[in-house]
Structure formats: C-alpha cells, structure tokens
Amino acid sequence: MAFHKPEQIAELVIEAGVQKVSQTLPAMLILGFLGGAFISLGFLLNIRVLGNLPERWGSLVNVLGGAVFPVGLMLVVLAGGELITGNMMSLSMALYAKKITLVSVLNNWVWITFMNFVGAIFVAYCFGHLGGLTEGDYLNKTVAIAEGKLHESFGRTLILAIGCNWLVCLALWLAYGTSDFVGKIIGIWIPIMAFVVIGFQQVVANMFVISAVIFAGHLTWMDLARNFVPVFIGNVIGGAGFVGFAYFACYQKQHSNMK
C-alpha cells in the first residue's frame, strides 16, 4: 500500500482544485447532483440503522450509526462526485497557490452547493418520502435528528460545523494520500465516523435530513435556511482554514523548494 508524504498530498489537492474549476458546466452539475445524492444515501443508511436500535444502548447507537454513514463519501471519492465541503479545501488551496482565481472558486462553490442540494432533495423526497424510508417507524428518529441540528444557537452551530469539515477534509486528505482502493476506504471511514458520532454539522447532510422532515410535514424551509447559513460558514472555515490553509502554509512552500 503506497502512501504519499504530506507535502505530496498538498500538491495533489492543489492539482485537484485546478481540475475542478476546469470542468464543463454539465459535468459540474451532474457530479454535484451525484455528490449530494451519495451523501444523502449514506445518511439514509445511518437512519435505517439507528431506527432499529434500542435507546438503552446509549452511545453505542451513535457508534453503529456512524460506522455506516461514511458510505456516502466513499461513493463520492471512489465512484465520482463533487461535494461542496471537499471543494472548500481543494479549491482554497489552489487559490492560495495562485493557480485559480477567486471568481472561479465562487462560481464552483455556488453551482456545487446548488446541485448538492438538488441531490439531497431528490433522495429525501423520492426515497425518504415517496419510498417511506424516513417515515413510518423511522419518522421519530428522523425528526429527532433534524431537530437536534436546529436547536443550537447560531454561534454554537457554526462551531460544530467547523469541527465537521475539519474532519471531512482530513478524510479527503487521507484519501489523497494513497492510490490504493482499500487505503482510501480506511482513510475516509475513520474521520467521517468520528464526525458523526461526535455530533458535528455538515451542510449537505443537513440539507437531506431537514428536507426529509419537511416533506413529512414537520419543520419548514425557513428552518433549513436558518441552519444553512452558520453551517456553511463553519464548513468553509473548517475546510479552507483548518485544513486547506494550515497544510498549504506548512507543506506547499517546502514542496515547491524540493522541486
């Protein structure tokens, strides 16, 4: 199993950021939809597991649910998809390296965020609502998860979102660190399970679960909008700052000197 050094990973992430802004609009839209749908499918799997577990199991319930959630990001990385939270890291690093412009970054972020939302809505409505997978016996659990995302203050929600994308982007960083299929799965699985068990907030996952509850007749689109703002900002800080800027500052200059 081959591993890249951190300075090599930094270069790979920057190259990925350049490639992402070079995609055609149709490709960007399709991959953005898939990214949102894949993350939502991972969350749907999480809900189906949690809904059958007794509450008396305590924290073990969250661990088991968190163990299956990473399927979503595995599909994004291994099958192909664009996820806004990952792009917050890769495009920011390419911007820091002066390989792309701020306009191209914002253009990508807007389209990918929108299409991630479309993908999340698709899974929430078609599979969650029409298919009944987040309703019936699973509705109480779905509502509890969604309401848990909404009861925190703006500031606390933002902080929880920072922690989330710190771990999500570390998962992607580890995935860039190896070309081995199994290595990528392991690298993704551990940090993503951690963010779910801890209770951090990820903007695309929240799009799915809150929308599912809206379609079931609970909550409103304004609830989703109020949650979106602090979570998106926090995810940007976690991805572009705590991972992207931190590793660019430490490794990119060193790698450039080596070349």
Curated annotation (Swiss-Prot):
PROSITE patterns: FORMATE_NITRITE_TP_1 (PS01005), FORMATE_NITRITE_TP_2 (PS01006). Gene3D superfamilies: Glycerol uptake facilitator protein. The chain crosses the membrane at residues 27-47, 67-97, 109-130, 158-176, 188-216, 228-250. It is found in: Cell inner membrane. GO terms for molecular function: formate transmembrane transporter activity. It is a multi-pass membrane protein. It holds the Pfam family Form_Nir_trans. It catalyses: formate(in) = formate(out). Residues 1-26, 98-108, 177-187, 251-259 are cytoplasmic. Residues 48-66, 131-157, 217-227 are periplasmic. One of its GO terms (cellular component) is plasma membrane. Keywords: Cell inner membrane, Cell membrane, Membrane, Transmembrane, Transmembrane helix, Transport. Belongs to the FNT transporter (TC 1.A.16) family. Acts as a formate transporter. This is Formate channel BtFdhC. The lineage of its organism: Bacteria, Bacillati, Bacillota, Bacilli, Bacillales.
